[in-house]
Amino acid sequence: MQNLPKWKIFLSIICTIFAVICALPNFTQVKSKYLPHDSVNLGLDLRGGAHLLLDVDFDTYLNDTMENLADTLRKSFREDKIGYKNLLVKQNNIQLELRSQEELKPLKRIISKIDPEINVEANDNRIKLSYSESRLSELLNKVVDQSIEIVRMRVDSTGTKEPILQKQGDRHILLQVPGEEDPTYLKNILGKTAKLIFHLVDENANVEEAVKGHVPMGSMLVQGDRMGYLVVKKKAILGGDSLTTAAASFDQNSQAVVSFSFNSLGSKLFGEVTKNNVGKHLAIVLDNKLLSAPTINQPIMGGSGIISGDFTVESANELALLLRAGSLPAPLKIIEERSIGPNLGADSIESGKKAGIIGFAAVCIFMVWSYGLLGLFANIALSLAMLYVLALLSLFQATLTLPGIAGIILTMGMAVDANVLIYERIKEELNKGTSNLYAIKTGFESAFATILDSNLTTLIVAFLLYIFGVGAIKGFAVALTIGIISSMFSAIIITKLLIDIWVKYFKPKKLGLV
C-alpha cells in the first residue's frame, strides 16, 4: 500500500491557495483590506509611456567644484599670508603662480587639509591642482547616484508612477515611466537643476557698468525675466538644501507664489541675515536666473517666506516640486527620447496573450497525445505553474515586459521538458518489467538530478542577465527565474502527487507509457 506524503499534500494546497489569492487582483477590480491588491506591474512596452536616456554633465559639476575650491584656497591663502597671482580654474583644474618657491610647502599643507586626494604639480612657481583618478571616480559615482534619487523624487513625488531608473555606463541614467503620456512634462522637470540660492544685493554697484563687464570684485551679475539685471554679492547666504518644505500658494493679491520653510539651522541663519540687513534687498536666484529681490523690511525669525515671480499655478507647483525634491548635483542632458503610445502597448499585450495561449495549447495537446493520462497530469501541473508565476509577479511587483512574456512562454517548454524526461525514465523502467510503483519512484529519482542541473545552469544565466542587463533584459531574467522555480516545483511535486493519488486510489494495471 502506497503512502502519500502528507507534507506534499499540505504544501501543494497551501501554495495553490496562496497563489490564487495573490493572482486574484489581475482578474477583478474588487478590493479587500484583508487580501493583496497588487496586480502585475506592466512594463513600458506593454503599458506605453516615456523612455529617456539622460547624461549627467559631470564636467559642469567638476568645474563648479573647482570654482568652490578656488574660493576656499583664496581665503586660506589670505589667512596664511601666502603670496600668489593668476589663480584661475581651467579645464577642470586650478592653475596659479606662487610668489616664491618657499610658498610651496605651506600650500601643500593647506591642500592636504582640504582634500588629500588633490594632486599638486609644480613647475617652478607655476602650480597645477587636480583631483586624483580615484577621487574623480568616487565623485562621479556619488553624483550619478544622487541624480538618480532626485530624479526619482521629481518624477514620482506622489509614489504612484513607479518609474524605472537604472544606471547605464559611467554617467548615463535610463528613465522609463510607464503610463506617462506627456514626455514634455518630464523634460521640463528634469532639464532644470533647481539650484536655489539667496544672495544679498550689492546696493553700491552700478548695474549699467556691470552689464558692460565691469562687475565689482566679490559680486556677480544676474538676470531675470521680470526685473532685468541686478548685481548681487557672489557669496551665497543660504541654499535650497536648507529648505524643509515648499508648496504653491497665493499671496494677498491672489497671485501664485511658492511658500517655503527652512530647517532649524537655515531658520537661524536666515533670521540673522534679515536682522542685520533691514532695508536692503535679498535676491532669490534659481539656476543663475533672478526670480525676485524683495526688500527686507524687518527681521524674519520664523524661518519661512515666499517666492514671487509672475508664476502661473502650474509653474508654481512645478517649482515647489523641484525644491522639495532638491537640486541636482549636475545638469542632465537628454540624449535619447522615445514615447510609446498606449495603443501600441495594448497591441503588445494582445500579441503576448495570443502567443501564450497558442503555446500553452500546443504543449497540452502534445503531452496528451504522447503520454495520455500522465500527459494530462503534466498539463494540470503546468497550469498551476503558470498560476504560481502570475502570483509571484504580482506579489513581488516585478515589472513584466514583452521579453518577460517570452521568458514565461519559454518556461512552459522547460516545465514540460522536465515531465518528458521523467516519463521517459519511467518508460525505461517499465520496459525492464518493473512494477508501476517502482517505475514511478525510480523514474522521478533518476530524472531529478538531471532536471536540477539543467535548471540551475539556466538560473545562473538568468542571474547574470539580471546583474549585467538593463531594462527589458532584466524583465526577461526576472520572468525566467520565477518561471523556472515555479515549473520545477510543479514538475517535481505536483505531477508526482497527482500520479501517486491516481495509482493509490485507481490502481491502474498500465500507465500507458509502453
From Swiss-Prot:
Record-level GO BP terms: intracellular protein transmembrane transport; protein targeting; protein transport by the Sec complex
Gene3D superfamilies: 3.30.1360.200, 3.30.70.3400, Multidrug efflux transporter AcrB transmembrane domain
Transmembrane segment boundaries: 7-27, 357-377, 389-409, 448-470, 482-502
Topological type in the membrane: Multi-pass membrane protein
Gene Ontology MF term list: protein-transporting ATPase activity
Subcellular location: Cell inner membrane
Pfam families attached to this UniProt entry: SecD_1st, SecD_SecF_C, SecDF_P1_head
Free-text function comment from the UniProt entry: Part of the Sec protein translocase complex. Interacts with the SecYEG preprotein conducting channel. SecDF uses the proton motive force (PMF) to complete protein translocation after the ATP-dependent function of SecA.
Subunit organization: Forms a complex with SecF. Part of the essential Sec protein translocation apparatus which comprises SecA, SecYEG and auxiliary proteins SecDF-YajC and YidC.
Annotated protein name in UniProt: Protein translocase subunit SecD
